[in-house]
Amino acid sequence: MHFLHVVQLYYPVNTGAGRYFAEVGERLAREGHRVTVLATDAYDLEYLWNPARRRVAAPEEVHGGVRIVRLPVRRAPGPPIVYPILRRLMVELSRLPRTEPLLRRLALVTPRLPAMRRFFAAGERFDLVHAGNITLDFAILPALDFARRAGAPFVCTPFVHLGEPGDGSLSRYYLMRHQVDLLRRSDRVIAMTSLEADALAARGVPPERMRAIGVGVDPREVAGGDGARFRAQHTVAGPLVLYVGALARDKGAIHTIEAMRRLWEAGSDATLALIGAPLAHFTEFYERLPAAAKARIRLLPYAPDEVKRDALAAADVFAMPSRTDSFGIVYLEAWCYGVPVVGARAGGVPGVIADGQDGLLAPYGDTAAIAGAVGRLLADRELARRLGAAGRAKVLRELTWDRIYSQVRQVYEELTERRAPRAHSETRPGL
């Protein structure tokens, strides 16, 4: 069979959504199926609205047995701020009834992919279309229209960021009227957690079309870290608290630093290591930190995977109190090393971390509570060991990529087998 995956940022870009589609697509390719990925030429997410950021030059290549077609991004005239202004306008319009048609048109103003229409017009046949990341709807809306015209089943993995309980300031960018309508019209919606599925069902997405599957890790790929090497190379003598993720306020990077400053003031000798790509507001925050705080921090932006594995092997506690994770693969990576995790009670994270059983949760942005959770794990090593071991057991039992893929594959089978009697089923190899 021939599957089309639509994902806005893909290899060589390292994103959670890109990894998800790569794990599914490359396994399909190994089974003998054809997989085409339609991506943009953005390397940095910000390139979608800011041409000064990085892009991927190659228009097409094959990686992991998957054909990648990169469509050039085009933007409306004006400075980069046009995009966030437009999205805020759309959020406000979404408060009004019957604005779905207008919102769909506005979603395609900027960024846009004129080459996508030409790609679809070329007549290439696909047995199923699977798109992801609902907030970047400029690529998903045309894919759904194409699937409907072609008679192909359409699957969406929206990666909805639910934000903090009772606070819709983040989720409203993922749950606008036209976005929810798109999910209602999808043949299947793959949610990260039951929390996300429940939120979508409350907005009218049919529960019988949803599957809460999530993401996974490959423990063999994560293994091999050398904690002693990390400690020697980065001069870490005592306990190590690790953060891995985009260095941004919404991801909890700033709150983690502020929580650690509380612990340092209370006498803790722990070191904080931060690995990830820094956003501009984080860099400004970090530059204003006093020298004494910087001396306790190991800032490692853009560290390679080998360094990340070494850091995981060296860590005593992993903390990423984010509100913008629909799942959070990096918690699973920490668990592979038996490291206890601290997350925020926001987004899909409470559907991943069982508070008090395999990790600890704190309210997003509550630096006192975050400090309390990290400090508790540093002080009570038996609790830390028990939570880390429980997390590792959960990963091996439920959250490997092989298990996740088998569930996604089952969704594909449901849809393609239902369609098979129509149009050329006798010439297609089955899943």
Residue ranges and their predicted role:
Residues 238, 284-303, 309:
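Nucleotide-activated donor-binding/catalytic signature segment of Leloir-type glycosyltransferases, i.e.
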Residues 138, 150-185, 191-198, 223-226:
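Nucleotide-sugar donor phosphate/pyrophosphate-binding loop at the beta->alpha transition
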Residues 323:
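Aromatic "clamp/platform" in nucleotide-sugar-dependent glycosyltransferases that forms part
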Residues 4, 190, 235-261, 273-275:
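Conserved donor-binding/catalytic core segment of Leloir-type glycosyltransferases
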Residues 43, 217, 244, 271-286, ...:
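Glycosyltransferase donor-sugar binding loop
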Residues 355-356, 360-367, 376-382:
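Conserved acidic donor-binding segment of nucleotide-sugar-dependent glycosyltransferases
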Residues 317, 340-343, 353:
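Short hydrophobic beta-strand element within catalytic cores of glycosyltransferases
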Residues 201, 217-233, 284:
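Acidic anion/phosphate-binding donor-loop and adjacent secondary structure
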